[in-house]
Amino acid sequence: MRLVFAGTPEPALPSLQRLIDSARHDVIAVLTRPDAAAGRRGRPSPSPVAELAAAHGIPVLKPPRPNSEEFVAELAALAPDCCAVVAYGALLREELLAVPALGWVNLHFSVLPAWRGAAPVQAALAAGDEVTGATTFQIELSLDSGPVYGVVTETIRPTDTAGDLLGRLAESGAGLLEATMDGIEDGTLTAVPQPAEGVSIAPKVSVDDARIRWELPAHVVDRRIRSVTPNPGAWTMAGELRIKVGPVTVPDDGPKDLEPGEIRVGKKHVHVGTATDAVLLGTVQPPGKKSMNAADWARGARAEDIRRAR
């Protein structure tokens, strides 16, 4: 099939590469978001998908308004049979959806109808789900609600961060997307409506959402931190410093008398109290510095910065 691939960040790369390598499909163009500021100097930089497409000599489309009449006409002129989407980053309107004869197929990183929205991996981890997955479905106007072509599942491991889990789903989802494209081309695959029950929403995670709430139980603090690692990154105030906090553990032999947010510094360990057990900090990143061992940070910190996290 003649395919246009729409995607932007790194998790979309395995899917694009699978379709490029496929002997059955021809990726005739890539649709991605416009160059965005990156690095300390904030210079505009192409998306990971744009870079991979350019490396393979595939035309790259970066419309600032993908639903504009001008871009709808530009896409129609390419005459794609189908458009595949992985984390493109913009909602598509009716006129654009009508361009390819076989529609638009999205790879979404959850088992729909669970966790529709922008942050399904983060939501699954924060909720304490034991299993998640990836789904291919036909895009409709309403958010992530279209009929489903296929699903793969993935067990969530106790130490998974969002980065870990998304990396595995990006790989397994790439195979699912290729198989879905094959089935659509063959006419052997039929999309099945999503069930009305079990719908949940996963909105985009903001920096404010990533602030650690030490008044929650330890196991909730643990999974909420992992759900925003590496991005946007969990953080807390320690004294007057805003520090990023890496994944924590909940040791059986940790102190039992700490109040939520109270910090206790040992020779080799730093514990912080929660609503239940204390958690053991692994790494922290103070402002303007690289990530470091929490105990090393505490030894060099001011006394007022290591009394309480909030």
Swiss-Prot record:
CDD domains: FMT_core_Met-tRNA-FMT_N, Met_tRNA_FMT_C. Keywords: Protein biosynthesis, Transferase. Residues 283-310 are annotated as: Disordered. GO terms for cellular component: cytosol. (6S)-5,6,7,8-tetrahydrofolate binds at residues 110-113. It catalyses: L-methionyl-tRNA(fMet) + (6R)-10-formyltetrahydrofolate = N-formyl-L-methionyl-tRNA(fMet) + (6S)-5,6,7,8-tetrahydrofolate + H(+). Belongs to the Fmt family. PANTHER family: METHIONYL-TRNA FORMYLTRANSFERASE, METHIONYL-TRNA FORMYLTRANSFERASE, MITOCHONDRIAL. This is Methionyl-tRNA formyltransferase. It comes from Mycolicibacterium gilvum (strain PYR-GCK) (Mycobacterium gilvum (strain PYR-GCK)). The lineage of its organism: Bacteria, Bacillati, Actinomycetota, Actinomycetes, Mycobacteriales. The gene is fmt.
